[in-house]
């Protein structure tokens, strides 16, 4: 019976839904609050706290189709991808889970029913493995299900390994939940080489594991002892690619429908006719991991998750180049992938434009990196004294510039050099070892504080509440009492204190009793409990005491305003920059807010201004901030946006601000948008590739920010004015100096008319103030005489006349300057000894000055 991959996925989820399981959406490829994982690599990752007993959900049975990535860290399939039938960087894990509900018998029965009745796989093609000492599982398979004993294989511990170190015994870490597992294998037939599990030939491809059922029934302590869990659980996983290959009658995962569409599209884009080329498989696999990682917020970078993504992209591009791809090609496969993945690609379709842009930019940048790498490689070859390029240089080219070793080898061979392959492999192995060490769990889960109590939050409508102390912890250990000075965690039965979540910081305040005062400095979630972190300031506090829990209301109010502002900011950014904008993190404090979002370019000043305008417009409209409780599906249908990386219960709080913003949010908010008062962005910048950060303030802090900005502008204006005055003074001093020098030169042009010294001159570039200074200087130098100076500045004529006192009875400066002014289209006058005028006809100035001698002669 043929089934497409999409049909297999839907059949699996529907089957387990019919068995009372809650269908839970695939979680992000970026693990939520789990620093032990680089990427989500199994279906159980999002339920880890449920298995650990730190979280309780509304359901005890769940089923998922989880997107997974294994590349980098402890689980790294990258080097094998494309060269085997079943290695992938990206895959989907179908799973069903029981949290203290059903156990081995039901889990095994469900698996067998789905495989043999829903998928109708031949029973004689299936065989199973159990842990060597798990007689219970063996008997269920043999006696309840009816699998012949010769098709049930017991798998023990690995030779030379530790106890329980077996393919059929699962552990979460060095300590914590663990247990045996049973695996189901499919026999592809005698025509394919390979042996049954547990035989020397088990690595062959005949018998393929398709489903693993893990039975968490023990808690392993640090000393190695196994304690039975009071409520054992079930974690199962079945790779959709493997089961789809069986349902589609093919042997290799790369032959299933999803991969065939991608392989054919790649071949068409790069111009490859050989559809069996392994490079096509590499590209088809890598476009899946790269696209979904970017859609989940990972951006190419040089560290952490971003570095793994960059390596995968470059590996795909390199294989495209090997196939002869011309120009960028990788991003063109995103649309093909979204179509091929069916219902699993709903989020990818929303992010398609962003994913394509990120891939295109990264591929273009890699082209430039290749060019730089070639320069370094050729320089290294030129500097060689021998004929072998050392492994460290080869590794540097690979690790720093993304230069594949095979390309380095090709270039070296063309120039009759060889490369030190052993040295390169050594450097690579050292890097792998570092990655493995970084990816190890190494976590003692028993060291985590476990609280059986469940706190009820009652702080949406109140900041003060009477409550009972249900648990106390000092340095991770539970205690019955606290003494003054103890730094501790207090758990209350119910509390108005909000625990840090969704970017909103935890509340602070006090817990009061008749005999003590506990200062709450922070509030955090601890499983299903709310932990009040702080110090007992005075008195004593004991488990069972009744306290009055009082939240710092003023601080809470400031936080709520900033939290509501982040919702408006998010909506405004999506309007201004585009629907691709998604929240990647936030921090909401009393003092300010910080908002991280996906965007590939710096936000321009004009865009920031428009974002501010939109937010403040919504504040002025004073929308009521409404909260509605509804199921998650109804919230999605309403268009509510979910926060990146957050986990939500079946029932969620939907926060609406008019028709401008609708988001899922469990935080504390203002009553109306008008309460925010004012919104002001204080900074914008990039924090990672494709991730921007905006910091902003609201209310009084926004006014202070605007006032500070205004003061800054005023200071800058005053500084500019002072500088201008200083420059003007300096310029005038220079002009005076020039005038003094010019007057010295003009003395040589003095002539005598009727025994009187006369100076007539045209001086371009000098202003009127400079001319006056020159006239005074010339008078002093001449002792007795008549002076007439003219200049042209900005097409305007300036005139000034000076007459020493002994000659003013015969020649008056005012009459002289007026005579000249009339000839240049102006007029003027002044005292007998000094007068000035202006005119508009600069072309007439030479002839006007030429008439001065005759005019003076007539009057002497």
Curated annotation (Swiss-Prot):
Q: List the disulfide bonds.
A: none
Q: Which UniProt keywords apply?
A: Aminoacyl-tRNA synthetase, ATP-binding, Cytoplasm, Ligase, Metal-binding, Nucleotide-binding, Protein biosynthesis, RNA-binding, tRNA-binding, Zinc
Q: Which domain of life is it from?
A: Bacteria
Which reactions is this enzyme annotated as catalysing?
A: tRNA(Ala) + L-alanine + ATP = L-alanyl-tRNA(Ala) + AMP + diphosphate
E.C. no: 6.1.1.7
Q: Give the cofactor note text.
A: Binds 1 zinc ion per subunit.
Q: What is its main location?
A: cytoplasm
Q: Does the keyword Zinc apply?
A: yes
Q: What is this protein called?
A: Alanine--tRNA ligase
Q: Which organism is it from?
A: Vibrio vulnificus (strain CMCP6)
